[in-house]
Amino acid sequence: MASLFKKKTVDDIIREQNKELRGTQRAITRDRAALEKQEKQLEMEIKKMAKTGNKDACRVLAKQLVQLRKQKTRTYAVSSKVTSMSTQTKVMSSQMKMAGAMSTTAKTMQAVNKKMDPQKTLQTMQNFQKENMKMEMTDEMINDTLDDIFDASEDEEESQDIVNQVLDEIGIEISGKMAKAPSAAKGLPSTSAAKSKGISDEEIERQLKALGVD
């Protein structure tokens, strides 16, 4: 019951118009078919009268045939017009839908613009950039500190390896920690022993100086 008093939308009106146009097109097609049938009958009647030599009857029937063919031609023109109207209706419907979509989009954009504060948005972006820079600086400082720690550890290990290598070259055996190593005086081989191993006095002296032994 409520649908009887419901206001028709544009889509409803266009749908009804298209329905009427389709009905009109079908009626024109039926009318043309009837005219074509009548046209054939007139042609047969004219031929029949011509065979009997009835010229007056042939003349009257020929005039009727001419009028009938003109009417058939008019049906094609009307049918073309109806098709054009149907196409225009579809185009109008599409345009109205696009206009409605644009209107909805405009309202949405307007609502978003009302909610958005350009100054506040700019401030938010600036704060984000500032905090991002702080985070990057903190991350860089942490990385630098870790690099220093690992570099120092690697330098210490490398230095210890060099010391062990030098001590081994001059004949001091390393077992356990450095604190348990024999003293430099006891552990150092004699000059003759060093020479027997092919190490010169200058080389021993240089290596001792490198170890801080005077």
Curated annotation (Swiss-Prot):
The keyword Membrane applies. InterPro entries: Snf7_fam (IPR005024). It is a peripheral membrane protein. Keywords: Coiled coil, Cytoplasm, Endosome, Membrane, Protein transport, Transport. A motif (MIT-interacting motif) lies at residues 202-212. It holds the Pfam family Snf7. Residues 25-55 form a coiled coil. GO terms for biological process: endosome transport via multivesicular body sorting pathway; late endosome to vacuole transport; protein transport. Probable core component of the endosomal sorting required for transport complex III (ESCRT-III) which is involved in multivesicular bodies (MVBs) formation and sorting of endosomal cargo proteins into MVBs. MVBs contain intraluminal vesicles (ILVs) that are generated by invagination and scission from the limiting membrane of the endosome and mostly are delivered to lysosomes enabling degradation of membrane proteins, such as stimulated growth factor receptors, lysosomal enzymes and lipids. One of its GO terms (cellular component) is cytosol. Residues 178-200 are annotated as: Disordered. This is Charged multivesicular body protein 2b-B. Probable core component of the endosomal sorting required for transport complex III (ESCRT-III). ESCRT-III components are thought to multimerize to form a flat lattice on the perimeter membrane of the endosome. It comes from Xenopus laevis. Belongs to the SNF7 family. It is found in: Cytoplasm, Cytosol; Late endosome membrane.
